[in-house]
Swiss-Prot record:
Keyword Cell cycle set for record: no
Keyword Transport in annotation: yes
Any Gene Ontology CC annotation: outer membrane-bounded periplasmic space
Protein name per Swiss-Prot or TrEMBL: Leucine-specific-binding protein
Signal peptide limits: 1-23
UniProt-listed GO biological process terms: isoleucine transport; L-leucine transport; valine transport
Function recorded in the entry: This protein is a component of the leucine-specific transport system, which is one of the two periplasmic binding protein-dependent transport systems of the high-affinity transport of the branched-chain amino acids.
Disulphide bridges, residue numbers: 76-101
Lineage: Bacteria, Pseudomonadati, Pseudomonadota, Gammaproteobacteria, Enterobacterales
Organism: Salmonella typhimurium (strain LT2 / SGSC1412 / ATCC 700720)
Amino acid sequence: MKRKAKTIIAGIVALAVSQGAMADDIKVAIVGAMSGPVAQWGDMEFNGARQAIKDINAKGGIKGDKLVGVEYDDACDPKQAVAVANKIVNDGIQYVIGHLCSSSTQPASDIYEDEGILMISPGATNPELTQRGYQYIMRTAGLDSSQGPTAAKYILETVKPQRIAIIHDKQQYGEGLARSVQDGLKQGNANIVFFDGITAGEKDFSALIARLQKENIDFVYYGGYYPEMGQMLRQARANGLKTQFMGPEGVGNASLSNIAGGAAEGMLVTMPKRYDQDPANKAIVEALKADKKDPSGPYVWITYAAVQSLATAMTRSASHAPLDLVKDLKANGADTVIGPLKWDEKGDLKGFEFGVFQWHADGSSTVAK
């Protein structure tokens, strides 16, 4: 039995990207964090979606029909994500690009699956999302199960630390990644001194830093997002701790440098490839810059690819029924700004690759050697 969507939901932001939608316009929900601690990631997502919709419509839309993005703020909060999902059901929208954080995507996906709404997430990396046999759930993001081993391989083969601490934020995304890295390091017989969690939103890491110093830790892997990592780096360096830090794409954000300052220099981070540096994407990069939008963020491109994939299936398929679009994408794939994409039966991408980058104090990054 399908869940009954709530008819009145408070605190939800829903803004049409284009005004005055016509009867033949195709509405697509764009869901991410406009508010909350990781709103910077939401900025990337919305910028990518807006540019993709603009470019697709400029080329004739979907057989003459325009895409209209309707934006919702879930703040990467699970409860708010459920409220947003119910709002989308009430709004009669059949297609969702989002959510971004794994912890908010999973509960929302339950509603979309029950209601027959196609969801393509550009950011949820936790493998559990697609392990439940759902038909309507897909993603253009890679998985923690591939990002974690990429980090572990680099740590074992390049860094070769002697005493490792693995820390996470006790959230689905961060802890999942931390455990994936832990598994990879254990296979390589690395010396993991401790594995522990902090509280998301925490700002005082004096006790943790004292512990790192006491245990002579020379390498820290942190599974989580940039607000906490930025504070850790800043406080560690202020206390004379020279330990190497590493994190996932959730920490690779210019806002980390705003928090950590010079302490951000040299942090290691696993991220998708730099799609803004692909010559094939030059026109999109220039369009984003002309609109005063940063084209360097990974979620700009992964979200653009999600919208592209949806549009490709709509153009190819005789039916716009969500399940027919899912079947089309799984059978035929899609050519996108991040390359040709293929999906398995669970809705996961085949062969998505992460790279290891060195972060710099000015918010830029270069491929790690």
